[in-house]
Amino acid sequence: MKFKEEKKELKEIITAFERDYDVYKNKNSLFNEQMTRQQYIDRFLRLLGWDISNPRNLSFNNREIVAEEYSNSSDRPDYTIRMNGSSLFYVEAKKVSVNIESEIDPAMQVRRYGWNGGHKISVLTNFEYLAIYTTFHQPKEDDKVAYNRYKIYSYKEFVEKFDEIYELLSRESVLNGYFNEWTNNITPVNATKLSLDQVFLDQLNEWRLLVAKDLVASSVSEFQDSSTLNESVQSFLNQLIFLRFIEDNRFEGTEQLKNKINKHTDYQSYFKSLDKKYNSGIFENPDVILNMNGKTLKIIVESLYFPNASYDFSVIDLSILSRIYENFLQEEIVFDNKYIVKLEKTKSAKIKAVVSTPDSIVKLMVQRTLGEKIEGLSPDQIMDLKIGDLAVGSGIFLIEAYNYLENYLVDWYSTKEGVVATPYSVPFKVKKTIVQKVFRGFDINNQAVQLTKFSLLLRLLSYEDKERIIEISPLLPSLEDTIICGNSLVDERDVDITTMSYEESEDIVPMVNQVFDTIKFDVIIGNPPYLQTKEIIESTSNIEINVYKTKYSSVYKQYDKYFMFIERALELIKKDGITILLVPNKFFTVGAAMKLREFITKKYGLTFIIDFKTTQVFHGVINYVAIVQFGNYSDKTFQYSVAVSVDSAFEIENGLIYDMTKLETSHWFLTQDIKLRNQYEFAMEHFPNIETAVVPVNGIQTSANNVFLIEKKYIVEETKENIIFEVNKKKRIERFSIEKSLLKDFYQTPPKVQGRSYMPLIANKYVIFPYKNGKIIDYNTMEDKYPNTLEYFTNHKQDILPKVMGGKRDVQYCVEWYQYGRTQFLKESNVDKIIVGVMTNQPNFNIDRKRMLIASGGTAGYIALMKKEDSPYSLEYIQAWLSHSFTDMIFQTIGSSFEGDFYTHGTSMYEDIPLLPIDFSDSYQKEKYDKIVSCVKKIEEINQQIESGLNSKELKFREKQKNAHISNINEIFDELIQFKVENKSE
């Protein structure tokens, strides 16, 4: 029987419970919550796999269940269930005499905990009952006790329904993924709109407009400056949230802020006393509150309290608050006219929205790095560390780094003093010193800098007790010299301050020289901005871009901004320092990152890579990323692993070991498959690369496909000289004629049709090709010989007119207004070639004997492989080799990966693709070669038969026949590869 031992023990617990049930239920019973937890709830949780006694001796960082001390009077959940450092749900305990099945207060309390914690469920129990509540919805004053109650079990059902309870709440359920599955299933689609994140963000945005309107209407001229206005409003909101935070954490009296507002306190004196007590600059400036309408102030303050809101700032995780503020910073207050304000996306957000780094990723990165760095260190040694984030944003990485250090010190002090491990084990002065001395954060956005300071100070006070810190003055440290507004990529010495305008200075925000001159980091951690070259040009001044080009070797071709952050971070770490970043994984392979790869391999090092490949880790945004740990090491080896989920990444201990000296700069060939890696290294050492036989080229680029391409289905008439087609233009049909001699077949698979090797190539479109021998046909010749086409072009002149002639189209080397945007692939179309699908999820190499045109564009479209005249290898052999599974695995490894298991086959990759060589003087190899070529030709014949039209039975037979030939080809290649390995062919 499943759970036989667990059910046996549970029966014993229930028998003991029933024996004294009447005593427990008495309202005057001395059997309190502590006893209920110790005798019943702790034991029940243990049967579900959650053991608060920590039998595996996990560090405080890694504990999976954290219980509040029985004697602790703080208003926090009794149990926090965690996995990989992230809290999953709370369990709130009550003494047996509390009727949790019918009393509203316990239900409201546990729902508030869950909602403020960002959880999907919370559990309430007095052992007599166990109730599961959904917590995606903010509790309201008039809610009934059963509202959002998903399940409730009586203790009399515990044994009978143990399997069900175990499936829902056990440690095993969390580990095997079922917990996530069932909680996701019961959470409504619109839950994000009801979550703390969205509700609080909406209120912050509402409040900041209310405050801004008051300030603009005041007589203070400074508030007419949008930058000052935004910073002042944020500072004021920080003040209010800080006050609510210290109330809920019992450093100040309950509802003190509300009472002060209702009494119309002397705010200047009030803020002065707060500033003296807490220091840190939070209450330094009372200007906003002094210039606000009292009605506005009252509206905002009352919105922070129940029943108007269910906020509990003792429970809200700072990672959630950081995430909310990160979204808050995506918009700014702007003037619609002199006295009217509105919210608008910031300049950078308009170009590319910032997406919060998932908490679990942050925890993983901190754990992987600090776990190694601080092992065995004393508090004094930890206080000598320097940990930095060069693009600090909301401060989430520094907050989590602090969490990790504090939890490490909890273990250190509790072990030293022989006491139970709790956050109170660490002296507050030590915590304060760590926040002030260890962390450094930098950001170009001053509001982000202020937010990080604010978050660190809140974290310092979290899990603290008023009595422990009552004698400390000033209570909080100043972070003015450690969390700094400045450009991590540009120092003052990089620009000429004397010639810059104020606006340029505000835009660039060059870092003060002394900041980085006087510090080297033990650890740099973060998620730097991802901005492509095009986005950098749109958002960055020419002065700053010129600094990039002269200062950073990684600025090459279509570079990305994170390239420079990698380079900068590596320059700023100590000899034994570590840099760990979450960055797009395409820098392993793309051509634009070649200089960055050179920089890393020649000057620095790698420790490990956790590659998420196509697994998406960000919410609502597609990014292909990896966690990369860099270091300035003499050891030239690193470990490479692939993670299929964030949870699985926590389980990774060792990856495949690579030697950095063997990495090519053109691409890094990284795989977990040691057999594939060994085969590839052998092939690259003993085989020629395929560019000895073919030349990869891009297809045409018209820069106006809507004009130059004609779908054949729109052709309504055809003569010996012309085609006539119709187009629907602005709700009317227009008819045009094009000379056939200017038309070429254009190959492009229809939408949702996935190309593959050995398929017939069918052109469903024509492309107008106004060229002869690679040169544009001049206007007079067009007028004389191709008047129909010229008339068509003239009719669409506004669509194809080049920029240099007053139009919109990007055209290089402009001679005639109707030429293509680029001059590529104008001559190559006159010979047989292999057409390659650039973005596919399987081999897609096909011989084109119809001399069709193709189009290329980034990671889309097609390229062509042109056979070199002096190559002894036929197109048939090359097609077959490129379609073989070994070659396909190489493309999958060095190509950029995308969702749906798609990967690229662009022109830059072929120098790293080996070609299986044939010694034509060896009869064995020549025979194998001829068989491969013969099979490919037979496949082409079958494709021609399929094109001509077959009945379903014969079509099925021919497809079967084709597959047999493909299998024969692959078997022959397998034999040839084995032959080469055994004979160590050069």
Protein language model features and the residues they cover:
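Charged, terminal alpha-helix-loop-beta segments
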Residues: 1-74
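Short, basic/polar, glycine-containing "phosphate-handling" surface segments that engage DNA
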Residues: 1-24, 70-73, 83-87, 93-244, ...
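SAM-dependent methyltransferase catalytic region
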Residues: 30, 36-37, 45, 53-55, ...
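Polybasic, glycine- and aromatic-enriched phosphate-binding surface used to engage nucleic acids
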Residues: 95, 102, 121, 563, ...
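Class I S-adenosyl-L-methionine
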Residues: 201, 286-377, 807, 897
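Extended, well-ordered alpha-helical scaffold/bundle regions in very large, multi-domain proteins
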Residues: 240, 244-288, 388-394, 398-401
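Polynucleotide-recognition surfaces of large bacterial nucleic-acid defense/processing enzymes
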Residues: 276-277, 281-283, 455, 482-483, ...
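Non-catalytic DNA-recognition/assembly elements of restriction-modification systems
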Residues: 392, 684, 689-691, 788, ...
